[in-house]
UniProtKB/Swiss-Prot annotation:
The active site is at R20, N38. One of its GO terms (molecular function) is acylphosphatase activity. InterPro entries: Acylphosphatase, Acylphosphatase-like_dom, Acylphosphatase-like_dom_sf, Acylphosphatase_bac, Acylphosphatase_CS. The gene is acyP. Residues 5-92 form the Acylphosphatase-like domain. It comes from Yersinia enterocolitica serotype O:8 / biotype 1B (strain NCTC 13174 / 8081). This is Acylphosphatase.
Length: 92
């Protein structure tokens, strides 16, 4: 199956609620690599690389609201240059 890389920008109540760490756990469980980081505007940027189906499952999990305590109001995605990452990290 083809590998894809997606950049996602997640808006809503997504900082201070464990969103990045929960996204990391979900991504690793799906075999997806990349990173999540807080942005200055209150959003979270997620870059996900892996099998298309696994990346789509991660995006669907994010759309559904992510972890308890988070609220996703908007999710924007765009293609990202295919970058094989070693693992899924939290960036600061």
């Amino acid at each position: 199956m083809a590998k894809v890389c997606i950049a996602a920008y997640v808006y809503g109540v997504v900082q201070g609620v464990g969103f990045r760490y929960s996204t990391q756990r979900q991504a690793l469980a799906l075999g997806v690599t990349g990173y999540a980081r807080n942005c200055d505007d209150g959003s979270v940027e997620v870059v996900a690389y892996g099998e298309q189906q696994a990346v789509e499952q991660l995006m669907e999990w994010i759309k559904q609201g992510g972890p308890r305590g988070a609220r996703v109001d908007r999710l924007l995605t765009e293609p990202y240059p295919a970058t094989p990452f070693e693992t899924f990290k939290i960036r600061y």
